[in-house]
């Protein structure tokens, strides 16, 4: 027989070891990934009934010196023995589920799950949660900018994601947007490719496929795009483009200049084009539709690194052929190398404010004008929402509705503190930190409210370059539960490593600890349900025998339990310096 092509499983960060084990006792093999150098050394991916590995679950525990994972009692569920890095204390633990504790209000501190993505070196990739198939549940769309593919994870009724389906698309897709563009009740997906300098649109066909995108005619290089309602009842594709234009020069010869324009296109093919200021030179990172001045008309907000925020304020009627007034406004706290925005109704007036970050806090702002003939525009601060501390660095924000309150809960991603901060508005109308939840990973650039298992938003999604994640606020949470502990009675002993095996033929596996200060083997008996009982111990060698070799590796350095004599009984084999020591099991 031959082996099929390997199925590649990406993972978050780095991993020093991987084991195939049944971690939850369902008789299906799961994956345990270990990185001793990480503050959260253990993470796992459970295998579901469909044979698919679920997202990564990271667990917090003190630093470890070594570990051993095995099914000690034959119940098809893995026990884990760890040796603490500093104290040298051994612990017997299991992966267990527990009901989530209350976080704030009616929300629970549910599970944080991370879905690794196929890695890319591109600075940006398209990521989007949207209801693609019309079942009322949001699906996850992930662009592979290097391979010219689009991965679609359809959401199941229980809130889990199915294995991704792959569809061909442009290479270098940096932006994804979705809306019912043509009013047919189906979701259209828009893709912007920086490599191919194109914008395309596609939607699910009758066979459940996403055909290759049809090009949107632009005749220019697209810089950024979004889709949404600029006018009530219709979605528009909004694109910033850059093209070359020729005009007479000073000496009468033609000169080539770069022109930037805003293009608003409907599904009927009609498009309006508005030239932008010649001073607009930077590379925009995003374009959004938002009523920035709260006049009831949707505006276009453009973010560009190191530049002012450009707002294209929609007029009630065109003026000199232009529907938008182009204004550049200084953000509170100055420009940023990685600008971002969020939207929230922070004062309970039913209108969303623009949330802009300045290191450790957010400011909710509204665009205002002095009303003059040549109006001066600026941002008026309505609220300030502080992070958990002065050392916070807020890199993303999102909201969830809070039952019984006009004001939502505001979630802040704190990159420097590696935490998710939950803020709420108190009875006096002041925003305060209600809770801070530590996160194992914070390599994300965006947050979004999504619904898992429901049409209503009940979860916060995290968006990153090589992974996505989500934090639930209900259900159960995984934890690493200690069942028993053990400290060696060897004086000044230093437990270096551990393995397991049945050394007395009772059907249960014993623990073999390697102690490396006095060169002992320390046997510990595992007794049901989960008790560690001291057993036999002995020195492997006299210290003076290897005195000249004390600068070498700690000894004994490896052990294995196996039947090497062929009598059907397990033996103990040690590796010590340049020797292999065999301890046969006696009859």
Where are these predicted regions, by residue range?
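Beta-propeller-forming repeat regions
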Residues: 1-587
